[in-house]
Amino acid sequence: MSIDTIVAIATPPGRGGVGIVRISGPNAYAIALCLNGNKALQPRLATFCSLYKGNNEVLDQGLVLYFKGPHSFTGEDVIEIQAHGSPVVLDLLIKESIAAGARLARPGEFSERAFLNDKIDLIQAEAIADLIQASSDTAARMALKSLQGDFSKKINQLNEELIYLRMYVEAAIDFPEEEIDFLNDGNVSQLLQRIIGRLEEIRSQANQGVLLREGLSLVIAGRPNAGKSTLINNLAGRDVAIVTEIAGTTRDIMREHILLDDIPLHIIDTAGLRDSDDLVEKEGIKRAWQELKRADCVLLVVDINNPDQQNSLLNELRLTLPNKIPIITVYNKIDTTKLTAKCDEHTVYLSAKTGEGLDELKKVIKQVVGYQPTEGQFLARRRHLQALDEAKALLLTGQSQLTNHKAGELLAEDLRLAHQTLCEITGEFTSDDLLGKIFSSFCIGK
């Protein structure tokens, strides 16, 4: 690990009442003395100081806080300077700190040092960035839960059960002369099944956290004049798409971002799907299919007065799109009929024009993508889901080895690999490439 002393501005760019410069590393205290004219600092106390340039010219006044390692965020000596929030003043403080022996921090390097010094685990480090970037109050609360260790505790408890099972299995392999066949006495099978069930429960909770963090890509598709643009306008609560009676009005991709019960919803309106000789419209249709293949969920909007549109297009979507992408059929323009709004598992009847049935649509979207907020919810990332899925696959393989082949050695190896995979979530076992990828996405100064 680097023993450089690092410095960065910890507050957002721009002018403000207060700006914070953060310094961390073995020379942090000495650099602070260079900046404040050798005024002694007491740990965990704020000291009002004049702040000087190298020629002893005062450049500002502010508070200087000293956190002596290891009792600091990074585990190192940390200095935080609270100066006036002028970009010029803050830049001068950075330059003076570098002149005194610091270097500019990389994005996320303060959090990386906290992780490497065992102040936080990898889940908590990611939660810092997620809390900063939270798009709703629920997402912020869930990120805080992850930062406080809720998600980490679940993974650590799962690992403890897995370690116990590994010890049990490996003892049975190492002492085959024992009268009791530990591998086949039922305990191993029961313990393994319990761990798989617990993993599935955590995976379900993590999936809710991913939805809250990353949101949902919702693509609106249909024939021309089915009411797609009217629907996106109604969902957005404002006019974001041009609506006319002329078929083919929407030719390019239209994007809008809203919150659906705290889920970030990335709505994409597309050109009407049909055969066309118009070069511009053909390009719009091509882009529509590209967006459909990347969607998390598709709304197929059908003019209820032309229900035959639905069958051919729905079949085409099912043949073209991956099976994992759910399709909700939206029968629009019920205001032109005697029908009222209603819904079932994958079908909604509504009027995009009047808004009748919009609540039913939102309900179906949440059901289809599996959003079920729970008390123990926490924020998570896709890499966590991938690791949980990989660990489950290994455990199921091990279960098969035990049940079908009585292969204790193969089961032990699958348990070891599953344990290693779960340790990657918290960072107990990880690679430099993964750390670089995670921390490089952080703000400088965090």
Curated annotation (Swiss-Prot):
Its EC number is 3.6.-.-. It comes from the Bacteria. GO terms for cellular component: cytosol. The keyword Cell wall biogenesis/degradation does not apply. Mg(2+) binds at residues 229, 250. InterPro entries: G_TrmE (IPR031168), GTP-bd (IPR006073), GTP-bd_TrmE_N (IPR018948), GTPase_MnmE (IPR004520), MnmE_dom2 (IPR027368), MnmE_helical (IPR025867), P-loop_NTPase (IPR027417), Small_GTP-bd (IPR005225). Residues 215-370 form the TrmE-type G domain. (6S)-5-formyl-5,6,7,8-tetrahydrofolate binds at residues 22, 80, 119, 446. Its main location: cytoplasm. Signal peptide: none annotated. Its cofactor is K(+). GO terms for biological process: tRNA methylation; tRNA wobble uridine modification. K(+) binds at residues 225, 244, 246, 249. It is found in: Cytoplasm. The keyword Magnesium applies. GTP binds at residues 225-230, 244-250, 269-272. Binds 1 potassium ion per subunit. GO terms for molecular function: GTP binding; GTPase activity; metal ion binding. HAMAP family: GTPase_MnmE (MF_00379). Exhibits a very high intrinsic GTPase hydrolysis rate. Involved in the addition of a carboxymethylaminomethyl (cmnm) group at the wobble position (U34) of certain tRNAs, forming tRNA-cmnm(5)s(2)U34. Homodimer. Heterotetramer of two MnmE and two MnmG subunits. This is tRNA modification GTPase MnmE. The gene is mnmE.
